Amino acid sequence: MAQKIVRVGDIQIGNDLPFVLFGGMNVLESRDLAMQVCEEYVRVTEKLGIPYVFKASFDKANRSSIHSFRGPGLEEGMKIFEEIKKTFKVPVITDVHEPHQAQPVAEVCDIIQLPAFLSRQTDLVVAMARTNAVINIKKAQFLAPQEMKHILTKCEEAGNDRLILCERGSSFGYNNLVVDMLGFGIMKQFEYPVFFDVTHALQMPGGRADSAGGRRAQVTDLAKAGLSQKLAGLFLEAHPDPEHAKCDGPCALRLNKLEAFLSQLKQLDELIKSFPAIETA
């Protein structure tokens, strides 16, 4: 089964290629912190030879509480992304929540992301597709892997086939998520690159009453399990001080563990992709 390759600048993204990292922080807490986090990601990924795209949100529009921190907003967020791109020479990915945001975000960011909670919103999907930007489509917690085909079709019929699928876990009762490893193979049948968002798969939605809890201690185990499925890439959030992060700190990898973490994952990815395919159907 031929697998599509999506190109972002000099980076080639495909299920049979070395894994690509979409990594950064959950939300743009400040310009200085974003620069600090990106600098460490760039240092580590350059050392290890991992293709890298910086990730952060300019607005967290789906926080549990109305009092929760949301970010700097569209205008200021794009300024920070422009500075990061200029300073570190890396592509940037961020999420879009409303149709009117799609075009201005696509003019700055190399990849625009369709949030899991909004992945069936046709007007948003079409607006994003019409920018012709690369789109990272998060699989909603309530969707089966095979249902992602409908979202791909919406994008394709709007004229965009520069698409990536991203698993982030499925609802398992209340305040819990699980990852079905068989789902990766189902989504790969659509031939588009498939990523694994290990950070948000560790969430415990609403687990702290007014915010999400998480299981940071299990990030390495889950990331290894995901990449064992021969994926195009990993989606990861890290923070220098997770206990005081303004969003999803309980899920974030400690930034000072990034090199050791990615070193093991690179070795695993190389091993998995060295194996010949076995036809078992």
Curated annotation (Swiss-Prot):
First-level EC class: transferase
MF term (GO), any: 3-deoxy-8-phosphooctulonate synthase activity
Pathway: Carbohydrate biosynthesis; 3-deoxy-D-manno-octulosonate biosynthesis; 3-deoxy-D-manno-octulosonate from D-ribulose 5-phosphate: step 2/3; Bacterial outer membrane biogenesis; lipopolysaccharide biosynthesis
A single GO BP: keto-3-deoxy-D-manno-octulosonic acid biosynthetic process
Family: Belongs to the KdsA family.
Name of protein: 2-dehydro-3-deoxyphosphooctonate aldolase
Organism: Pseudomonas paraeruginosa (strain DSM 24068 / PA7) (Pseudomonas aeruginosa (strain PA7))
UniProt EC number: 2.5.1.55
Covalent S-S links between cysteines: none
UniProt KW keywords: Cytoplasm, Lipopolysaccharide biosynthesis, Transferase
One Gene Ontology cellular component: cytoplasm
Catalyses which reaction(s): D-arabinose 5-phosphate + phosphoenolpyruvate + H2O = 3-deoxy-alpha-D-manno-2-octulosonate-8-phosphate + phosphate
NCBIfam families with a match to the protein in the record: KDO8P_synth (TIGR01362), PRK05198.1 (NF003543), PRK12457.1 (NF009109)
Compartment(s): Cytoplasm
Pfam families: DAHP_synth_1
Origin superkingdom: Bacteria
